[in-house]
Regions:
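Internal signal-anchor transmembrane helix that establishes type II topology
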Residues: 154-168
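Cytosolic/nucleoplasmic/matrix-facing N-terminal domains/tails
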Residues: 1-146
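Long, low-complexity intrinsically disordered regions
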Residues: 146-153
Length: 168
């Protein structure tokens, strides 16, 4: 399954090109806060597809040759066969790439891409989940800040106090 190999490569490359078809691109997004549901989301990489980037950069073919034990040339031929298959499927229906997303054709024949939402290709954010943050009522904090704080000093034995402080 080529989609599985593309998904693996996306964890380590910001661009994975399928020669003669297009490229999957990653863009880093900072952590974000959604005010409507008080949710902090970790940093992520958003996935997009560019049909115009079709030149073979060798990344996918080299990966396939290493993983499947094929020659580089044989890997390029296998990718070409699969691209032909994908193009035929797209003419009829949508193409679902597991762990990547869904591809379809628009009326002009351009490829549209709908990425899977639950996959974060940013390794630094591995296992981080969105965090719900409750709103803090500032008026309650202001009330407690105005309360005086009293300290009592033991005047009877100041030497013990200094010994205690010096022990730290």
């Amino acid at each position: 399954d080529l989609a599985k190999h593309i998904g693996e490569l996306l964890y380590f490359n910001d661009c994975v090109t399928i020669p003669g078809f297009g490229s999957f691109l990653l863009e880093k997004k900072d952590a974000s806060y959604n005010e409507s549901n008080n949710l902090y989301s970790p940093p992520t990489k958003s996935l997009s597809f560019n049909q115009k980037l079709q030149s073979n950069d060798g990344v996918l073919a080299l990966h396939l040759s290493k993983v499947l034990g094929l020659s580089y040339e044989k890997s390029v031929i296998e990718i070409h066969k699969l691209v032909m298959n994908w193009n035929e499927k797209l003419k009829i229906s949508k193409l679902n790439l597991s762990k990547i997303g869904e591809l379809s054709l628009n009326d002009e024949g351009a490829i549209l891409f709908n990425p899977k939402k639950n996959i974060n290709y940013l390794i630094d954010s591995y296992a981080l989940k969105p965090v719900n943050a409750e709103l803090i009522n500032r008026s309650d904090l202001e009330k407690t800040e105005n309360m005086p704080v009293y300290f009592t000093v033991n005047k009877n034995n100041p030497v013990k106090l200094f010994r205690y402080a010096a022990s730290f």
